[in-house]
């Protein structure tokens, strides 16, 4: 089956002005009752999007909803499993590890109006709240000029247009789950005081790009462990990509400043390789960043959501 972008969820780079990431655990008290709610949610989620989009005159609304491996096995024990959906166990690094945080359900809502984001999440949670508990809820925002909270432009090397589809959406290599995607969600907190104390030239060496012009440095200008050096997957002399967003979040009164990384990928193995390289090759950005969470989810296609709604999985 060929990829049909009209049948994918919103797994492309459209960070939005207002962002909500919510991860949930199922109560696991009554599987049949919980499955019924999930089936209802799968049926309603696109209707909620259409309704709110009409009332809000668009506002750039995007929604992605997905399942962890444990949730998939619990809810759909007799169904086939997406080929690369695994129970994420974390990644061992040299100085820091990628933590694995238990979660069953993933919700990523973004729009250009905070009231729209709130309305969508609130309506979805009306259904999910009785059968779940919240693992994490993070509210992100659009930072100046589309920059990450570390003040560098975000996503310059992201695949775009057809290339984004090729790297972000499952194809015919897994025909039962074509048009789906693998989402890796990871929350970081930064020591921005220490980061901002660095000279701009040092920050640029550690990132691999100019801070203000966003021009990539020459290889000999970069630190050997620069972020845009070690965070790549260049196996077989080919650059493998994902669709990534680094969404700023903060509680300034508490001194908390961070990034919520979300990577949508056709191949989870690509994201995993990038993370492994970062943490085993001591990405310089990690000297100023602490990983808080790590979670892998499968984002079903609209056809798979329809099958869930109809009880066909």
What is each residue range found by the language model?
Residues 1-313:
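Long, histidine/aromatic-enriched segments associated with O2/redox biology
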